[in-house]
Amino acid sequence: MNPYQNKNEYEILDAKRNNCHMSNGYPRHPLANDPQMYLRNAHYKDWLSMCNKNNPVGLIPPESFEWTWLNGTVAALTIVSVIAGILVTAPVSVTAGLITVLGAGAALLAGITPLIWPATTDNTFNKITDATEVLLNKEISEFVRKTANTKIDSLQQLIYYYQNALENWKKNPNDSAARNTVSTRFQIVNAFFVEAMPALSMPGYEVVQLGAYAQAANLHLILLREGIAYADQWNLARDPMHAAGDLHYKEFLDYRNQYINHCSTWYNEGQNEANLKNNGLVYQRTMTLFVLDLIAMFSTYDPRLYTMPIKTEILTRTIYTDGVNRNEPKSIHNPGLFRRLEQMKLHIYEYQGAQFLSGHQNIFRSMNYNHPLIYGPVQGYSSSNINKITTINLGDYDKIYSINTESRNRLVQGSTTFDKINFYGAFNENWLFSVYNQNGPIIKHSNIPGIDAPSTGLNYSNYTHYLSNCIFQSNRNGGSAPDYNTQSYVFGWNHYTIDPTGNYVTDAFEVNKNLPESRYVPQISQVPAVKASDIFNPGRVVNAKVESGPYFTGGDVIVSKAQLDGSGLARTLITFPIIPKRYRASGFRVRMYYAANHTGQVSYGVANINTTGYANFQKTFDGWEYFRARHEHFKYIEFDTTFSLRNSGQLEEHLLHIYYPNTTKISGDQLLIIDKIEFIPVGIPLNQTSEGYNTYDQNTNSYNQNYNNYNQNMDTTYQPNYDNYKQNSSGMYDNPYNQNPKDSYNQNYTDTYDSGYNNSQNVGSNYNQEYNTYNQDTENMYNQSYNNYNSDNNNYNQNSDCMCSPGYNGNYECRCNQRANGNYPK
């Protein structure tokens, strides 16, 4: 029997198969199914030209809409989309077969400034502020508005002033006058940002100015990132006790904490007030787009942690459009593992010769496509008299970007019912649900940002969100049959940067197929924790589940809660279905972004492959409530093994194991918050330089952070001791380098990844990173000692109170010197 054959009682609307499969070993879910793929073959000038247009890379032009709130929404969507595109595809130029990867810092600032200050319309600060005034029904005073505008106008002039000097220096990199000019102008703009930020958060107007504040914070952090990247050439903060850029890197970390905590605090204040005023859903959606999506990107700006382009998957949150045929007064939170909406079943009830939509069922698939479908409950009216079910099949690939509904007011009992629902798909497909009744239709468009679609403004080629959830209600108005019910929907949407077909891990993206081996540019792959497929809690001691994330993570997180009672080994297991594709890398380093209120151990392994890595996590915050964790409490730990993943594109299961000996009863919940897993490729042979990434040599499984003369006598908190770190012991670290016990980090290694991170190219690849002048005179909150490191077993024993586990070679990335100076949470 043909399962797609139409029956009298069943109708199936099926998506056409996508025949655009890549011949790269992806049997079901091609890695090329990527909304940002069109940027990957763009050279820098072409890419910059796209970004400097009012309609960048096919996105929606802000000036094409009349409504104030819509202008602000579209502007915010455009900026986040451009940031995500730049991070994942860092623009490149190719000269004589040599690829130059242009650092994301420089590209970000060049790309978003024309979006912040477009040539033909008002600036984005004002658009977003105007929209927030409408949202909150609160007008900013004339004094506050003028003060803010004065600062914004000055910022615009100073940034252009700096960018002119930057372009001049790039044309004349050996000219000392050009170098001094750009360095001076950078520092002037940086100082003005510090002075201007309070004007965007005036007392009494913190929430209404919050969107503008977030945009300014974003610009400031991008500027600092750029200065850190060029610090060596510009001689920034250079003296015998500092490495170039160290002062600005510390400021970057401090200001990032300050900005994120400020935005989190005041978003929360506004959400609470909006819920009380029955405007919670609109506030949640609007301010997520204006503020939370943007600050979630800040974690990727760290130039010493992200030394190559990033395959970003951050915005896993779901936002909801306004209810159709009903008002949804409160914000909506439904924490759970990420799932793809694969089918919808619409139940039709016939009564007195008329047909009515009476029920709706969502059918999902987890990130493991080998698992069975997940059937949600039937929402609405359920009866044995249902005589037709329309099934909408999205298949493996298609996504719905807009929904148009037609409803009718019925004379009987004043109910409202759906006649037509048109679902528009990303592959230019559409599905029509229809029943026939009388009276004129009430037409509603549901999408992000909320316009008529499909149209030139929003269609299958330029959408930013796709349908992920349908909440259906059939509210009875007094009758006993479903025809007396008012039917309503609330639709949930995910951001297009989150791939609903799987977790793809790749070591590089292809720049130009016509080039030889040098055509690949390495990239870091992110896998959000909520894109796990399973959480297994075998006992009652440890319970891990998905919880609403803090406001800066871009979505929900997995929280493991252990109540240790001394009864013996306790554990939980989280399964990540990974689809790896290696082009050139010898393997991957793996790290985890987390926060915890205790110390403990985790392991990471690959099923059916005898490889397991271990890492100790440290206590990063106090208290027994996970939602009290602030941005500065989240740290990275790296597992102590390089993972040689398959290169076939076939799904494999990765296992994150949290375990406790549980030999002693401990009071209070032991909390571990997991936000994401990241994969860093190692051993990629390339012939390229990396402008803007020139501080580091990203080589094999050693994280080279340029701490040559890092002076920590400036209120920092991390004091590592490298002297007795046993690295090549019992084969645990069988890597092609050795640690010099006299504090000289000599990476004499045949460089398989000569990317110019240390501003030198193809020079024998001997990167001598001296720690001899590392000044450990500090307040020493975190005295990290490797003296007791026992490498005779696989138990990564880190005798430390530090928040960071530094992986293989000491401090691969310590963010413990971040300090909180915000007031979040309340």
Curated annotation (Swiss-Prot):
The keyword Cell membrane is annotated on this UniProt entry: no
InterPro entries from the UniProt entry: Galactose-bd-like_sf (IPR008979), Pest_crys (IPR038979), Pest_crys_dom-III (IPR005638), Pest_crys_dom_I (IPR005639), Pest_crys_N_sf (IPR036716), Pest_cryst_cen_dom_sf (IPR036399), Pest_cryst_dom_II (IPR001178)
Keywords: Sporulation, Toxin, Virulence
Pfam family, one: Endotoxin_N
Taxonomic superkingdom: Bacteria
Extent of Polar residues compositional bias: 720-743
Family that this chain belongs to: Belongs to the delta endotoxin family.
Record PANTHER family: ENDOTOXIN_N DOMAIN-CONTAINING PROTEIN-RELATED, PESTICIDAL CRYSTAL PROTEIN N-TERMINAL DOMAIN-CONTAINING PROTEIN
Note: Toxic segment of the protein is located in the N-terminus.
Name the UniProt record assigns to this protein: Pesticidal crystal protein Cry27Aa
The organism of origin for this protein: Bacillus thuringiensis subsp. higo
Upper classification of the organism: Bacteria, Bacillati, Bacillota, Bacilli, Bacillales
